[in-house]
Structures are given as structure tokens and as C-alpha cells.
Amino acid sequence: MVHILANPKRFLQLSARIVPIALVLAVVLGAVGLYGGLVLAPKDYLQGEAMRIMYVHVPAAWMAMFIYAALGAASASYLIWKHPVADCLARGASPVGAAFTAVALVTGMIWGIPSWGVAWVWDARLTSVLVLLFLYMGHIVLLHSIQDSEQASKFAAILALLGLVNLPIIKWSVDWWNTLHQPASISSLERLRDPSIDGAMLWPLLVMGAAFMFWVMALLLLAARREIAHRRLRVQWLRGGRG
Amino acid sequence: MAVGGGMKLGRHITREWRVWWRQPGDWLASLLFFILPVALFGFANAVVPVSFQTGQSLILLVLVLALLLSLDRLFRQDWQSGILQQWRLRDELGAVIVAKLLVLIASLAIPLSVLGPVLVYAVMSEPLIWGVWLPLALVYAILALDAALLGIVTAALCLAARQPSIVLVLVFLPLCLPLLIFAMGAGLAAVEGTNFWPPLSVLVAWGMIGVVVVVPVTRYMLAELE
């Protein structure tokens, strides 16, 4: 599958079909999820209405981690097989990932004020997610600060792979340390069968998670398509300049 | 073959060691950068006292920052003068990286990890307890070694960047934060007399992975440079 997508032409054809479908699914599922979360789901007995920010905060945090994993996979693929599409995906993934991490952090801070009394605490979960934002930023800066584009891609790919160590820390930080941040309510398929969150609150969250997943898929594909188009333009310009 | 490799390594270690001593400004700056903020922290602590736990955590952070200061120059002169390219052609990059790493550890990581726990007690004005000092020294030493291993990779990573010093800070510090989290956890456990081995063993594991990975990864990056 990875090797089939390595051909830019085939990738462009396939992504042109996937992007509109993913965007439509994201909008439909997002509308259903938001209606379920903001209107149908009961308010929390402790946190009241403030808990509804969860329907944006949690999927954004999931996506922040998922995009970094995708960035790591694309980087490994680029370093091992030299797939140009993998490089385009990696280049597009870090700004999208940084945006979702920032959304997760900001919504978390907004949620923290009514539930903890403070917007920010230096506990392991919050700090490790902040580190994730810095890793995305470091990746963007490194990509743009090395003049040779191919060299920049290789070095940024190594940085992305080194940064993967942060993902398990984020995931298990709430279990390894005593944190103010609550433990995961649905950390695995087993927990999904017996979650610590009421079913009426859970289904909109899962629907929002799916909506965010399709949205991210569309954004990543669009970013990769943009990068491919940019490279083609550059090649055309160079050919025109020489001719 | 092994004898030839050992001789190459010995030659590079001697060279690195000489270069290091001929440029005392570089390593002295790092050492002073470590001592000065810690001394100022001691002064501030006399006015507004903080706990011993907080103090040792802050000093761990300063140790990493002091190490960061020395990283930018690690490969820069050799790269700019073209020597790195010659070593690449002679297939000596691996030996160069190991030599630089060993000299960095011997000249900076070890002095910082020895100074660290000494300064913690000096600044915090606490009575010396060997049962606390020894684990603390171990935490400082392993953190310094791990940070040096990471530092070699990030120094090579940022070599070709337009503003290498700034990029180095942006790349090195986020990668160091997981190390700091575990080091601070181990330091805190050592001070409180609880079990400090779980977080410390994570640091040791990190170091062992680093020992295996750092040289080939750095070599790959240096070979990619024009």
C-alpha cells in the first residue's frame, strides 16, 4: 500500500477522490457529534455545562498525537524508501499537528479554569503536550532553516523520529505520575466496553473523534497535494528558465 | 583491522582533546554558565527560601542549559574548514563522532555532574547526607551522559541551519524535556528517601539506546552535509 502511494501521480488521483469524501464525512459527523454533545448529552453533575468543551478538546488532543505518529511514519518511510510523497506528507503534517496541539492546549486551559480553578498547571500531561507543540515547531523551523530542500527533509525526518519518544510519555503520563489531569476514560478497547463515562456522553465524543479523524485526513492530503504542486511548479519554472 | 580502528580513534581523541584545551573559552563559558546562575539562585534562596526538592530540580535544568551552550561549536569549525568532508572521504566519521562524544563527556558532562550535587548542598545550605548525595550524584551523572548523547545528534542536525544556535535551542530542549522529567522524578525520590530506581532506570535505558543509535545517526547526517 505504502509503495503504491509512493507514485505522486497515483497519489494525486487517489487523494483527489478521498479529500471531498473525507470533508463531507467530517462535516456530517461533526454536525451530528456537536448536536449530540451540546444538546442531547446531559450536563456533568460536578462540572456542569463546562464539560461540553470536551467534545472539541479530547478529539483535538487525539489528533495531535495521531498526526505526530503519522509524521513519524512518513519520516521513516522517507528515510528508508526515499518516497517523495512521504516527504510531502511529513512537510504538511507538522503545521497541521501544531494547530491541533494548540487547540488541545487552549481548550484544555479554558476547561481548566472552571474545573481546577487555574488555566495551567505544570503536571506531566500538560507539560508533555506542550513539548509536543515545541517538537512540531522545531520540525517546522528545521525544515525552513536549511537551504538544501532534500537535506532539510532528511534532517527533519530524523528529528521527527527522535521526537516519537514523547508519544508514550503523553499517553501514559496520567498513569505514571500523580497529575491533576484526569486519567483516560477510554484508553483501550476493553475500557470502551466498560467506560468510566456515561453512554449518553460517550457516543457524541466518539462521533466527534471520527469527524476530527476525517478532517485531519483531508487536511493532510491537501497539504501533501499542495507540496507536490509546489514542487512541480518549481520544476516547470526551472525548465522554463533554462529553455 | 580492529587495531587500525583503535589507532584512528586514539588519534581523533588526542586531536579533540588538544583542540578543546586550546580553546578554553568554550568549555569555561559552559562551566561558568552552570556555576553563575546556581550561585545567583543561592543568593535568591537566602532571601526567599525554596525547598531542597525544588532547588535540586532547578539545578538539573541549568545543567542541561550549560551543556547546550557547548553544542553549537562541536562540529562547526571542522565543517566550515572542510576537515569533516575529508574525514568522510577517509571513512573516519564514526571515529570522529566517538572521539567528540568522549571528549564532551570527559570535559563537560562529568565535571557538571560532579559539580551539580556539590553545588546543590552549597546553595541550599543543607547538612550533607551521603545516602542522599550519592543517588543525587548518580542522577546528575546519568542525565549529563544522556544529554551529551542527545546533544551530539542535535548538534549535527542543526549544523546546516541558517541560524544554528536558535534552531539548536528549539530542537534540543524539547527532546531533553522527557529526560528532565525522569531525572527530576529520580532526584525528588532520592531527596525524599523513596525508591528512585524506576525513573532512574528509564534514564539508563535511554542512555543505552543512545549509545547504540547516536553514532550511526550522526554519521548519516554528517555524511549528508555538503
Positions of the model-derived regions?
Chain B
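Membrane-interfacial helix-loop-helix connectors in multipass membrane proteins
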Residues: A46-T54, P117-V139, G187-L200, L225
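A structural motif at transmembrane helix-loop-helix junctions in multipass membrane proteins
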Residues: Y140-L173, A223-E226
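Long, hydrophobic alpha-helical segments
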Residues: G55-F75
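Hydrophobic alpha-helical transmembrane segments of multi-pass membrane transport/permease proteins
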Residues: P24-N45, L58-L65, A109, V171-F182, ...
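Junction motif at the cytosolic side of a transmembrane helix
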Residues: M208-E226
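Selective transmembrane-helix segments that form parts of the transport pathway or gating/packing helices
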Residues: L93-V120
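Short helix-to-coil transition segments within interhelical loops
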Residues: Q86-G94
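Aromatic- and glycine-rich beta-strand/loop motifs that create alpha-glucan
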Residues: A2-S30
